[in-house]
């Protein structure tokens, strides 16, 4: 890959060193497991969590005479992902053998794509912010390529005191290796890139993005340089499996390299591992180059070819992606860019919000989903798929507010009841006597009693009309929060002679 610097140095992202400023350069190779029922070149299952070596075919185990057969669904998933990345789709690509010896690689080589990948250049737009002025910064990160390849098996070294075991369940599972250009200039940009990429493949349904299960992991390439100078020597941090760890690994590695260079040393090109317990990287091996793998075309596989109609059919069936959905939420529902960004960050959240917002005010629905629902889920460590409050229940609460049946304060209490106990919101309001008081006579009686009991406050209001809010609060307290706030405010102002 030819390295091209497309970014203008930005002082906001410089790292101060003992001898001046430095700039970190980051590129990523993300391995995303293809969502498919069977492996890339065999019919073995890809189901996660099965007993060791139970998802293994003769092809996966590299038994003599077994030939690979391409899985068409994996090809379609790769093309869908390429389209989602606004990338060039190569209608002719080749599979190559990447030769290296490792115990969990039965063939002695990995079937991958070297010179002719299935997907060419594309892009992802990430958004950083908001800043203190509430503004967002959009940054375009280039995609160099996407290619299909087999995953390796798994070596297990903690099962026996003197032996290592090999589990081939993962061997032969289809991976999409998505290679970015070296366009990122901070750990925040790298985390935003990984978050956005995971969101895109989840929307597309081409990868589940579950990093804790290993179905999405990143090799992070890090180098440093003086601003405006040529790229430095990079180190690759292998198999980082969380977005938080990606940020920590980049920050540590950048500081490590800066320290070496400022002491007069040189950076060795190498592969490193990130230790999340210590928050640091450590050397794994010297970094290999392409010639070390002795790539050559796989003689068992014909070139992969398809026509325009194949690509057009897949493009026509693509779902609405995060950027398009965010733009629609802002344009049609009047949401702020920030709120829309939160709601589209996960497909499940966007789907939930749209179900709540259907036929209702979009801003109101967004406030309840973001502030109340997501806030409650964050406090309990749950995600949107685990929510005890259905879209229908939250929508019913919003409807009760709009109808004047309950006040906003009562609605908060009602939400907590539904969250912890469940039930139909309307029935809960009825059975627990939570309806707000709209009877003007009853509200007026409460207002008169509060005014009569607080003559000193009445005098203060005459001098400072904004003090009327104190009376509103006292009336709401006296009625257990059930009085209609607008009616209370109007009566208080009328009784105290405050003009609107």
Curated annotation (Swiss-Prot):
Coiled-coil residue windows: none
BP terms from Gene Ontology: glutaminyl-tRNAGln biosynthesis via transamidation; translation
InterPro entries per the UniProt record, alphabetical: Asn/Gln-tRNA_amidoTrfase_suB/E, Asn/Gln-tRNA_Trfase_suB/E_cat, Asn/Gln_amidotransferase, Asn/Gln_tRNA_amidoTrase-B-like, GatB, GatB_C_1, GatB_Yqey_C_2, Gln-tRNA_amidoTrfase_suB_CS
The name this protein goes by in its record: Aspartyl/glutamyl-tRNA(Asn/Gln) amidotransferase subunit B
Reaction catalysed by this enzyme: L-glutamyl-tRNA(Gln) + L-glutamine + ATP + H2O = L-glutaminyl-tRNA(Gln) + L-glutamate + ADP + phosphate + H(+); L-aspartyl-tRNA(Asn) + L-glutamine + ATP + H2O = L-asparaginyl-tRNA(Asn) + L-glutamate + ADP + phosphate + 2 H(+)
Lineage start: Bacteria, Pseudomonadati, Pseudomonadota, Alphaproteobacteria, Hyphomicrobiales
Keyword Iron: no
Quaternary structure (record): Heterotrimer of A, B and C subunits.
Function of the molecule: Allows the formation of correctly charged Asn-tRNA(Asn) or Gln-tRNA(Gln) through the transamidation of misacylated Asp-tRNA(Asn) or Glu-tRNA(Gln) in organisms which lack either or both of asparaginyl-tRNA or glutaminyl-tRNA synthetases. The reaction takes place in the presence of glutamine and ATP through an activated phospho-Asp-tRNA(Asn) or phospho-Glu-tRNA(Gln).
Record-listed E.C. numbers: 6.3.5.-
Keyword Protein biosynthesis: yes
Broadest EC class assigned to this enzyme: ligase
Family: Belongs to the GatB/GatE family. GatB subfamily.
């Amino acid at each position: 890959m030819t390295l091209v610097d497309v970014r203008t140095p930005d002082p906001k992202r410089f790292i101060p060193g003992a001898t001046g400023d430095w700039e970190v350069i980051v590129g990523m190779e993300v391995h995303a497991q293809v969502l498919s029922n069977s492996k890339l070149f065999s019919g073995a299952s890809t189901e996660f969590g099965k007993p060791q070596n139970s998802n293994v075919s003769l092809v996966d185990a590299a038994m003599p005479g077994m030939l690979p057969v391409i899985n068409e669904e994996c090809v379609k998933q790769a093309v869908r992902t390429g389209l989602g990345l606004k990338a060039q789709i190569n209608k002719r690509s080749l599979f190559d053998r990447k030769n290296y010896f490792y115990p969990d690689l039965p063939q002695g080589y990995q079937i991958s794509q070297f010179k002719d990948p299935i997907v060419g250049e594309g892009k992802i737009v990430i958004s950083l912010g908001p800043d203190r002025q509430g503004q967002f910064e959009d940054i375009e990160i280039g995609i160099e390529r996407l290619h299909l390849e087999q995953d390796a098996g798994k070596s297990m070294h903690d099962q026996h005191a003197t032996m290592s075991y090999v589990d081939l369940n993962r061997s032969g599972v289809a991976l999409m290796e998505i290679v970015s250009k070296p366009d990122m200039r901070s750990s925040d940009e790298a985390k935003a890139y990984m978050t956005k990429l995971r969101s895109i493949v989840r929307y597309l349904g081409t990868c589940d993005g579950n990093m804790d299960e290993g179905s999405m992991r990143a090799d992070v390439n890090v180098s440093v340089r003086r601003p405006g100078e040529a790229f430095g020597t990079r180190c690759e941090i292998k198999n980082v499996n969380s977005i938080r760890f990606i940020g920590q690994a980049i920050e540590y590695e950048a500081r490590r390299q800066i320290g070496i260079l400022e002491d007069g040393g040189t950076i060795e090109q190498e592969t490193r591992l990130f230790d999340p317990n210590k928050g640091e990287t450590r050397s794994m091996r010297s970094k290999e180059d392409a010639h070390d793998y002795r790539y050559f075309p796989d003689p068992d596989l014909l070139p992969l070819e398809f026509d325009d109609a194949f690509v057009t059919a897949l493009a026509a069936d693509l779902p609405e992606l995060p950027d398009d959905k965010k733009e629609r939420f802002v344009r049609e529902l009047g949401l702020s860019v920030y709120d829309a960004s939160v709601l589209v960050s996960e497909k499940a959240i966007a789907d939930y919000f749209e179900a709540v917002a259907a036929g209702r005010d979009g801003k109101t629905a967004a406030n309840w989903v973001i502030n109340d629902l997501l806030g409650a889920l964050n406090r309990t460590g749950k995600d949107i798929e685990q929510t005890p409050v259905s879209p229908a229940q939250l929508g019913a609460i919003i409807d009760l507010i709009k109808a004047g049946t309950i006040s906003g304060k009562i609605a908060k209490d009602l939400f907590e009841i539904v969250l912890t106990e469940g039930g139909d919101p309307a029935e809960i309001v009825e059975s627990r006597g939570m309806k707000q008081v709209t009877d003007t006579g009853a509200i007026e009686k409460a207002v008169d009693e509060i005014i009569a009991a607080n003559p000193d406050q009445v005098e203060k209001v005459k001098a400072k009309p904004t003090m009327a809010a104190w009376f509103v609060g006292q009336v709401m307290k006296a009625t257990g929060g059930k009085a209609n706030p607008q009616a209370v405010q109007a009566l208080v102002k009328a009784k105290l002679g405050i003009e609107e």
